[in-house]
A protein has these predicted regions:
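Conserved catalytic-loop aspartate of Hanks-type protein kinases
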Residues: 217
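Activation segment signature within eukaryotic-like protein kinase domains
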Residues: 138-139
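Conserved short submotifs of the Hanks-type protein kinase catalytic core
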Residues: 105-119
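Catalytic-loop of the protein kinase fold
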Residues: 150-166
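Conserved activation segment of eukaryotic-like protein kinases, specifically the C-terminal portion
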Residues: 191-205
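Protein kinase glycine-rich loop
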Residues: 39-46, 50
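Short beta-strand micro-motifs within the conserved protein kinase catalytic domain, predominantly
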Residues: 93-106
Length: 345
């Protein structure tokens, strides 16, 4: 595949639920009515390169991960299978996976949603001090995603800043499940596993090829957040102790994702997420009910619609009772509530 021009996805579409895909028995469908137009490079990882594209049909941006080495095809299909069964607001959403022929070459391409504010590595490169409140908000969302994965007996095995993506509205997306492992039973959950991941963020038990479980992801999470805490004077002792607990040498001493969510520092924030179920009579909930079924794949478009709907409600219900500034403040408050609704509901 070239790195410019239009990408036609009409040759093969792989069924992510079928692990027997090959040239002869792939599940296929004709999707020639949609093409992806190349915008720019988006990075390169172990599996292959990634590009940013736009759909000529919907004008929505996506990321396409292109895997060209045949020995990595199986891993790519496994990643697609996992993304297909992982429907969670804090996990990157898959659109499709397909094979593309280019002369004598074949690539497996995974199309996923585009996070419009880069990844946490980009935030590190900006070399700005991230405040504790923001780090806690990120940590909470990542733990929502990890808790979901671990309950499905899925280990990510490569948590690091480059694999945690961010949207401009603050929503976190865990991505790159290429090294992930679906554990089929409790015995396998406790077995010795393969040496995988990025060494800097790798747990001691994985480095030493010992038995490991979900706590290996917790260790990697702790190392990720330590990268943001070079100036420890900016953070509370409670926060520093929480992050320190994630990188304990013994896995049994590390908290689970659910235990992190129940930490006093995060519990109040978590409650704010969960309290959306009690917002049945709020203006924000009425807006949410009105727009939740709209097929908006771009979250910026979603929030623009929310803002427009909020203005309509304000005009209908309050008319001249509030100033424009007061209205704007309420819009921002409702956007926060709706942000939580997207994650929880």
């Amino acid at each position: 595949m070239g790195c410019c021009g239009t990408i036609n996805t009409g040759s093969y579409v792989i069924d992510p639920t079928n692990d027997t895909n090959n040239d002869k028995n792939s599940s296929t469908s004709n999707i020639e009515d949609e093409k992806y137009i190349y915008i720019s490079k988006a990075g390169k990882g172990y599996s292959g390169k990634s590009i940013k594209v736009i759909s000529d049909k919907t004008n929505i941006y996506y990321i396409i991960k292109i895997i060209e080495e045949k020995k990595k095809f199986k891993n790519a299909i496994l990643e697609a299978q996992l993304l297909e069964i992982c429907k969670h607001p804090n996990i990157v959403n898959i659109k499709q996976i397909y094979k593309e022929r280019d002369d004598d070459n074949i690539s497996v391409n995974i199309v996923t949603e585009y996070a419009n504010d880069g990844d946490l590595f980009k935030k590190l490169e900006e070399n700005k001090c991230i405040d504790e409140e923001t780090l806690l908000f990120w940590l909470m969302q990542i733990c929502f995603g990890l808790s979901y994965l671990h309950k499905k007996k899925i280990l990510h095995r490569d948590i690091k800043p480059q694999n945690i993506f961010l949207n401009k509205n603050g929503l976190i997306k865990i991505g790159d499940l290429g090294f992930s492992k679906l554990i089929m039973n409790e015995n396998e959950w406790k077995k010795k596993q393969t040496f995988l991941g990025t060494e800097k963020y790798m747990s001691p038990e994985m480095k030493n090829k010992r038995e490991y479980n979900s706590k290996t992801d917790i260790y990697s999470l702790g190392k990720t957040f330590q990268d943001f805490m070079k100036d420890e004077t900016k953070y509370s002792d409670n926060f520093k102790n929480l992050i320190k607990s994630l990188v304990e040498k013994k896995p049994s001493k590390r908290p689970s994702a659910d235990e992190i969510l129940n930490n006093p520092l995060i519990k109040d924030k978590k409650q704010r997420f969960l309290e959306v179920h009690n917002f049945k009579n709020s203006l924000a909930y009425k807006i949410f009910e009105k727009i939740k079924d709209k097929k908006l794949e771009d979250e910026d478009s979603f929030f623009k619609l929310v803002k427009d709907e909020r203005k309509k409600f304000i005009k209908e219900e309050n008319e001249d009772k509030e100033s424009e500034i007061e209205n704007e403040k309420k819009i921002e408050k409702d956007l926060d509530i709706l942000k939580y609704m997207i994650i929880v509901l």
